[in-house]
């Protein structure tokens, strides 16, 4: 029991001396003296054994000396620093402080060294977590001289070496090597401390939304045919785009089924890489160029636009026909038909069809197919701006108003295209009024009667109007009575009939005058005929022999 108590007292004494030395209270010589006496009192063995006990006490002292008030880990041997043949110190061993919170620090020193020869002290700091402002302090042994350090530093007035590490990451190591030269025999106690501020990092992911808009639409479209555009919106950024809105003003030359002039589409939030497609349909109102503009906006971002220009084409064919407003029956009349393409597209399979009224005969139509009163021309293509001209020669057999109808039909990329025109000609007939005068009894005795018959015939193709007849007789004949389609008057030897308002084509009327022979001789009877057609009156004379 006494032996156990003596051993415990010895360990306690050596540990106390080591603590006082590490804190700088005892000098090296004093610590060595106390340690030696304690060991001698504890064990009365031979001097050699005493020396062995003293060395063992130092080793125990090193194991149990607290560093920064942390548990000292078991010693680990390491190889000596520097070339083996030049070393004046023993194998390195390591003292480790377990600290799972901030920084783990280890210190490696040789087991023994030679007075006057430098030996290394290796300090290794390992980050247990991310730390900043890491300060490592080493207390130099009292009976030793500072030689150098790596990284380099300068001892303070109280014999301390200080290194500052701005940042030591988790798992990262920082090594410091200090060379000191012992000046006296004894134990060289070296203490190192570390102070660090744990670094807490917070990560906020920052991104930038990038809304892009593209638009697809036709380069060409047809008038009055639907035009469809596709608006593609995509978030090519790295953050969510909030409150994405697409606005599409309706172009002036377009109309939308909703009647609105600005179309608005609310897309809401769009994640990175998200894609949306909007389809809009318009109806073109007029030909020409139309530009559709789509604008996209989102919260905190600038507006982007995309536009597509479409040429609105109108397939158009025009036809006109020109001819005489009036003409005489049986006189040829020429009609000129003009066909043109004022549109934007090529017209194919163009058919020009001219239909004449019954009673009109086609005399000539170059390059056409004639069938009764129909004339047809065909053309494979009619380019924009191109025009064609056709002529047709006709003649009417009867008077009247006749219309010439022309229809043009064609095909294009926008469908069929049709146009029509007409021309009306008034065909006039020509009145041809003739008169024939004959006496029924010739010769005639004085005192007897004879009858003059006057036949008026319109041999023409048109009626005659205001047909008037007047008869004059010589003194040998005395008018007694008359008859006809109109009334008449007898004045002396003259008979005048009222005008006949109308004498139709191929119509014949007859006038008669009864005459009494009053004296012998060669009598004469003259009939004078006038009408609207006869600008100069026509006369006819008949003679009668009276005996």
From Swiss-Prot:
Keyword Phosphoprotein: no
One Gene Ontology term, aspect cellular component: periplasmic space
Cleavable signal peptide: 1-22
A Pfam family that the UniProt record links to this protein: DUF11
Compartment list: Periplasm
Biological processes annotated in GO: regulation of cell shape
Transmembrane segments: none
Gene3D superfamilies named among the record's database cross-references: Immunoglobulins
Main location: periplasm
Keyword vocabulary terms for this entry: Cell shape, Disulfide bond, Periplasm, Signal
Start and end residues of each stretch annotated as Disordered: 45-84
Organism domain of life: Bacteria
Biased composition (Basic residues): 52-61
GO molecular function, one term: extracellular matrix structural constituent
Subunit and partners: Part of a disulfide cross-linked outer membrane complex (COMC) composed of the major outer membrane porin (MOMP), the small cysteine-rich protein (OmcA) and the large cysteine-rich periplasmic protein (OmcB).
Note: In strain L2 the origin of the observed doublet has been shown to be different post-translational cleavage.
Full protein name: Large cysteine-rich periplasmic protein OmcB
Designated gene of the protein: omcB
């Amino acid at each position: 029991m006494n032996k156990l108590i003596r051993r415990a007292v010895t360990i306690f004494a050596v540990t106390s001396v080591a603590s006082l030395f590490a804190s700088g209270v005892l000098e090296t010589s004093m610590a060595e003296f106390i340690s030696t006496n304690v060991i001698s009192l504890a064990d009365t063995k031979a001097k050699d054994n005493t020396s062995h006990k003293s060395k063992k006490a130092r080793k125990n002292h090193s194991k149990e000396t607290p560093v920064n008030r942390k548990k000292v880990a078991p010693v680990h041997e390491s190889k000596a620093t520097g070339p083996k043949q030049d070393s004046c110190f023993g194998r390195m061993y390591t003292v480790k402080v377990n600290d799972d919170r901030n920084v783990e620090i280890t210190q490696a020193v040789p087991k023994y060294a030679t007075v006057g020869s430098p030996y290394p002290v290796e300090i290794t700091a390992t980050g247990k977590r991310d730390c900043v402002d890491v300060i490592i302090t080493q207390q130099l042994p009292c009976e030793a001289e500072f030689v150098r350090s790596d990284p380099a530093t300068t001892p303070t007035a109280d014999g301390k070496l200080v290194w500052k590490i701005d940042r030591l990451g988790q798992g990262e190591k920082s090594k410091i090597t200090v060379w000191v030269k012992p000046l006296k025999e004894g134990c060289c106690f070296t203490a190192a401390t570390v102070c660090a501020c744990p670094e807490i990092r917070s990560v906020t992911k920052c991104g930038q939304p990038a809304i892009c808009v593209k638009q697809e639409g036709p380069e060409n479209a047809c008038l009055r045919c639907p035009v469809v555009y596709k608006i593609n919106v995509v978030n090519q950024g790295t953050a969510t785009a909030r409150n994405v809105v697409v606005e599409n003003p309706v172009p002036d030359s377009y109309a939308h089924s909703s009647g609105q002039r600005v179309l608005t589409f609310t897309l809401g939030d769009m994640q990175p890489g998200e894609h949306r497609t909007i389809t809009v349909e318009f109806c073109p109102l007029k030909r020409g160029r139309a530009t559709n503009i789509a604008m996209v906006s989102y919260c905190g971002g600038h507006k982007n636009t995309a536009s597509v220009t479409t040429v609105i084409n109108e397939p158009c064919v025009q036809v006109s026909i020109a001819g005489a407003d009036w003409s005489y029956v049986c006189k040829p009349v020429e009609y000129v038909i003009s066909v043109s393409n004022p549109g934007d597209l090529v017209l194919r399979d163009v058919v020009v069809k001219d239909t004449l009224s019954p009673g009109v005969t086609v005399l000539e139509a170059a390059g056409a197919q004639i069938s009764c009163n129909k004339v047809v021309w065909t053309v494979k293509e009619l380019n924009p701006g191109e025009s064609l001209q056709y002529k047709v020669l006709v003649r009417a057999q009867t008077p009247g108003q006749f219309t010439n109808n022309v229809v043009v039909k064609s095909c294009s990329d926008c469908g069929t295209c049709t146009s029509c025109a007409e021309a009306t000609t008034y065909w006039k007939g020509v009145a041809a009024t003739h008169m024939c005068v004959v006496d029924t009894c010739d010769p005639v005795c004085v005192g007897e009667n004879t009858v003059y018959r006057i036949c008026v015939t319109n041999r023409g193709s048109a009626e005659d109007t205001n047909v008037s007849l007047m008869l004059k007789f010589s003194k040998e004949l005395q008018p007694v009575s008359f008859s006809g389609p109109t009334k008449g008057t007898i004045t002396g030897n003259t008979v005048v009939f009222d005008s006949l308002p109308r004498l139709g084509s191929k119509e014949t009327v007859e006038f008669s005058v009864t005459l009494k022979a009053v004296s012998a001789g060669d009598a004469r009877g003259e009939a004078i005929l006038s009408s609207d057609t006869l600008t100069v009156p026509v006369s006819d004379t008949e003679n009668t022999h009276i005996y």
